Regions:
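Short helix-capping/linker turns of helical repeat alpha-solenoids
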Residues: 3-6, 18-20, 39-44, 54, ...
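Propeptide-to-catalytic entry region of secreted or membrane-anchored zinc metalloproteases
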Residues: 143, 152-155, 167-269
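The catalytic-center signature of Zn2+-dependent metalloproteases
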Residues: 291-301, 306, 311-330
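Active-site scaffold of zinc-dependent metalloenzymes
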Residues: 247-300
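Single-residue signature of alpha-solenoid repeat helices
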Residues: 30, 58-59, 88, 120, ...
Length: 330
């Protein structure tokens, strides 16, 4: 085993040096002896041979043997190569258990994708000080759990590393404060449009999470900078950040197939703030307009917002409408 380890060290050094002549080991020689070691079920040799041959030229057998031999890099590669969710999670867990940073980050992403934040959190905690993407995701989890000061620290770390979304998160928490419906009702009426005769449409955006207030602020900023719309009699207020339990929203609201919310709690706010239309930015769902309320999710581009804005002006749609719908509308 010592002899095998010595050979592997020499071959790995030659591989890292791209088999330059100064190392004295040619690629063909290394591959010959690595094949011999693979036949002895040497997992590290299998992984090195897989790397030398490349993904296209290597046999899956080398990757699998290396993974079975607890080579963390191979376990991660093997996990990402399978289409089976069960196998992927199994090999991600095995690789992450060896404290392999990329595997821990990948497993955290897997858990987040499947809504298992409680499993992702300890993995992100372990990698947050080493990786800006993990720091950002960990900060998001902390914020949602009410650990705002810790969240800001990790957002700051990620932002200093150049993470653009972390910078936007810090901007959002500096500009906005989440309100309960009761707190919002006690706030003074914004003076923006009360004395402005050009505000024939007074639109108030709402958000209920850090992610959605970030998106709402981005839409608000884009609208303010959009010279195409400045001549219209439309006024858009600064977004309001409501606490998470203020609105009951669902991506398939009342089985309609589109995003929607129970907006009854906003009725008193609408009377006090004098807005004629509302925009609700939610986590997920298909954009639409219903009864003077525009529903968007965090993935909707500014162009979608402008498209839906046309519905507020009375336009049905920009494409031909079917006969039955045309008869109904006209």
């Amino acid at each position: 085993k010592d002899a095998q380890a010595t050979l592997l060290q020499q071959f790995e050094a030659a591989y890292n040096a791209k088999f330059s002549s100064t190392r004295g080991i040619e690629q063909a020689t290394a591959m010959y002896y690595l094949e011999k070691l693979v036949n002895l079920e040497n997992a590290d040799a299998a992984w090195l041979l897989y790397q030398i041959l490349g993904e296209e030229g290597a046999s899956q057998r080398f990757m699998r043997l290396a993974a079975l031999g607890d080579v963390a890099e191979a376990q991660l590669a093997f996990a990402m190569s399978t289409e089976s969710p069960e196998k992927r999670e199994k090999w991600l867990v095995r690789a992450a258990s060896q404290q392999y940073l990329p595997a821990q980050a990948a497993l955290a992403d897997w858990y987040l994708l499947h809504g298992q934040q409680h499993l992702a959190k300890p993995l992100l905690a372990a990698t947050a000080t080493l990786d800006m993407q993990s720091a950002f995701k960990y900060a998001r989890l902390l914020w949602d759990e009410g650990e705002h000061q810790q969240a800001k620290e990790h957002f700051t770390f990620a932002a200093k590393q150049g993470h653009a979304q972390a910078e936007k998160a810090l901007e959002a928490v500096q500009l906005y404060t989440p309100y309960t419906l009761g707190q919002l009702a006690s706030q003074p009426t914004p003076p923006t449009w009360l004395d402005n005769p050009d505000c024939l449409q007074r639109i108030q955006p709402f958000a209920t999470s850090l992610a959605t207030i970030m998106r709402a602020h981005s839409l608000y900023s884009s609208f303010k900078a959009d010279t195409r719309l400045q001549a219209l009699s439309i006024c858009l207020a600064k977004p309001i950040w409501l606490q998470a339990d203020a609105l009951n929203c669902h991506p398939n609201y009342q089985n309609t197939g589109v995003l929607g919310c129970n907006i009854t709690p906003l009725s008193n706010i609408a009377k006090k703030h004098k807005f004629s239309h509302a925009v609700v930015v939610s986590e997920q769902g298909k954009a639409n307009v219903q009864n003077g309320v525009m529903y968007l999710d965090i993935s909707d581009a500014y162009s979608v917002f402008v498209h839906e804005l046309a519905h507020f002006a009375g336009f049905a749609d920009e494409y031909p409408i079917g006969r039955s719908m045309a008869n109904k509308l006209c």
